[in-house]
């Protein structure tokens, strides 16, 4: 994959996330007039992007040692403060919860009164019950406002993968797709977005009960770094295990090579949990790929809701690629069709 003498491994930018230049999107990415698009804070938008797109963001709640908070895109607390606290206290964890039907009802009713056909691209149902709460609220709004169009779509993608879906949904709305068509488009398009991530430690997985504490302890001593991806439902799964951080980062780049669509008109996302140095390294490697020199790469920080489950040091790459459904077994493909027909 990489020549041992490749100097690229040494050419790592030290620029902090806060000092990165804001992402400049083309004029195609602006607030559409024909469709209102709503998303939630678990899409982990880069600073200023949601505002440029005109996307409304519903904030997820979480509870820390000092009480309840809302994921406001790191305005109330910096990502560094949040994750540094987890580094210093390995037992520190936050309680996360779904968005309630009542909160959704308030947001959707406000949209109904304004009248613009609305699409809500909701955080994957594989990781949160919020999707079902949103559907319940949408049904209540449809009953009260029968002429109002509202569609709830399970985005099937955690974190910044959803940001890519939102970006292109806005683009397609500006190209003339209706709200109904955007919902149908998003439900299909989400299957072409890939996401791969690696963790700095296994502590967060152990604290969340996903692996035994003993396994995390042994894994730490062996310098084991898991690489995760998400399946067709949006649930995180372990793809492989690497020995050492550098091998894990190289594995992310190899996955990019294997699955990237090579459509350079579509942006790539890199997201981290207070691990910008490694995020910068990933960008440098992507730009070395043929045709990717001028690619739009959007850097984001994972929010507190997902961040609590992956821990500090997580770094991920998300991009448009091949149809992920092609990798499903025949049985799983049939199961997906059954789910959609019900």
Segments from the language model and where they lie:
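N-terminal glycine-rich anion-binding loop in soluble enzyme alpha/beta folds
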Residues: 2, 36-100
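Glycine-rich phosphate- or other oxyanion-binding loops that anchor nucleotides, phosphorylated ligands
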Residues: 88-127, 132-136, 183
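Glycine/charged-rich beta-loop-alpha catalytic/anionic-binding loops adjacent to active sites
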Residues: 87-89, 115-120, 142-153, 299
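Short beta-strand segments
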Residues: 39, 122-124, 153-154, 318-320
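Generic beta-sheet signal
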Residues: 35, 116-120, 266-268
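N-terminal acidic, proline/glycine-rich, low-complexity intrinsically disordered segments
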Residues: 1-10
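Mixed-charge interfacial surface used for oligomerization/domain docking
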Residues: 14-32, 42-50, 56, 61-63, ...
């Amino acid at each position: 994959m990489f020549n041992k003498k490749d100097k690229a491994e040494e050419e790592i930018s030290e620029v902090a996330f806060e000092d990165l230049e804001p992402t400049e999107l083309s004029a195609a990415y602006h607030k559409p007039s024909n469709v209102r698009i709503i998303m939630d804070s678990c899409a982990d938008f880069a600073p200023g992007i949601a505002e440029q797109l005109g996307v409304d963001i519903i904030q997820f709640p979480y509870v820390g040692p000092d009480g309840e908070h809302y994921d406001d895109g790191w305005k109330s607390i910096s990502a560094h403060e949040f994750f540094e606290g987890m580094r210093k206290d390995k037992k520190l964890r936050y309680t996360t919860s779904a968005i309630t039907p009542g909160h959704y009802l308030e947001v959707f009713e406000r949209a109904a009164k304004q009248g613009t056909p609305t699409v809500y691209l909701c955080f994957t149902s594989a990781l949160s019950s919020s999707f079902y709460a949103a559907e319940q609220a949408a049904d209540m709004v449809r009953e009260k406002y029968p002429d109002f169009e509202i569609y709830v779509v399970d985005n099937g993608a955690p974190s910044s993968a959803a940001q890519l879906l939102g970006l292109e949904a806005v683009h397609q709305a500006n190209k003339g797709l209706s709200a109904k068509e955007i919902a149908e488009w998003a439900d299909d398009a989400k299957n072409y977005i890939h996401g791969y991530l690696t963790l700095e430690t296994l502590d967060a997985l152990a604290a969340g009960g996903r692996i035994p504490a003993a396994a995390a302890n042994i894994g730490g001593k062996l310098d084991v770094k898991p690489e995760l991806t998400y399946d067709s439902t949006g649930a995180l799964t372990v793809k492989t295990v690497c020995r050492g951080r550098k091998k894990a980062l190289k594995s992310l780049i190899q996955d990019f090579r294997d699955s990237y669509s090579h459509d350079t008109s579509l942006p790539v996302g890199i997201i981290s949990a207070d691990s910008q140095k490694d995020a910068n390294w990933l960008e440098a490697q992507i730009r070395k790929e043929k045709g990717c020199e001028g690619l739009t790469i959007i850097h984001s920080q994972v929010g507190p809701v997902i961040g609590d489950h992956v821990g500090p040091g997580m770094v991920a790459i998300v991009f448009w690629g091949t149809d992920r459904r092609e990798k499903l077994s025949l049985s799983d493909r049939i199961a997906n069709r059954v789910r959609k027909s019900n």
